[in-house]
Amino acid sequence: MSRLEQRFAELKAEGRSALVTFVTAGDPGYDASLQILKGLPAAGADVIELGMPFTDPMADGVAIQLATLRALEAGQNLAKTLQMVREFRVDNQATPIVLMGYYNPIHRFGVEKFVAEAKEAGVDGLIIVDLPPEHDAELATPAQAAGIDFIRLTTPTTDDARLPRVLERSSGFVYYVSVAGVTGAGSATTEHVTEAIARLRRHTDLPISVGFGIRTPEQAAAIARLADGVVVGSALVDKIAQAKDADQAVADVLSLCSALAEGVRGARR
């Protein structure tokens, strides 16, 4: 059983949803970013998505684009992101880490080398936003062969004809993007999310995590009553943008994570 399967199975047994947190690797700098990464599990993160900075983050909203820019300006690259996971794994073997981003940096790094190093570093899954199932052979197939889950994004515009193709080779969990568009955009209604989850469940047994537009503990709790996982990214990244220095960035991200975790954990009581 993979770390992701195990985590979702444990939480299902506990009768609660997972808090899935997204931060960009290297934002606001390597050391502070590593501190955030190491602090997230104790602050209540059940799964961590770590963004791989790329110069053209087309699916991301302003908050994550700016985070990417800060990270790149601080010298972050894919090798350093993998090193960050290695350093995280020294103290934490339990929390799943999913790398999220675009195919270009992986292609430049070399797919075979990337898959081998990601596996060795302790990466559990990949979300590659610009690689549709038609390109499985390029990365999804070798990643899954190495035991790394390949997590698919589905959206309100993924129709019933397309959905089975998208979900066919998915593993780990399904990431439902509750608002069509870029990250951090407005939030979806619970009615819409309820319908979307019911539709996805007709096509897959994988856990379903819902993200995009979730910013507060109250919103997180509302989604936690419906989905297997609640993904929060832009709200955490905004804390880094607003902080006066790296120490405040670390403290504020972890503080918001704790509040979100409280919302998620209390949702089904």
From Swiss-Prot:
Transmembrane segments: none annotated. The active site is at 49 (proton acceptor), 60 (proton acceptor). SUPFAM superfamilies: Ribulose-phoshate binding barrel. The gene is trpA. CDD domains: Tryptophan_synthase_alpha (cd04724). Belongs to the TrpA family. The lineage of its organism: Bacteria, Pseudomonadati, Pseudomonadota, Gammaproteobacteria, Pseudomonadales. Pathway: Amino-acid biosynthesis; L-tryptophan biosynthesis; L-tryptophan from chorismate: step 5/5. This is Tryptophan synthase alpha chain. The alpha subunit is responsible for the aldol cleavage of indoleglycerol phosphate to indole and glyceraldehyde 3-phosphate.
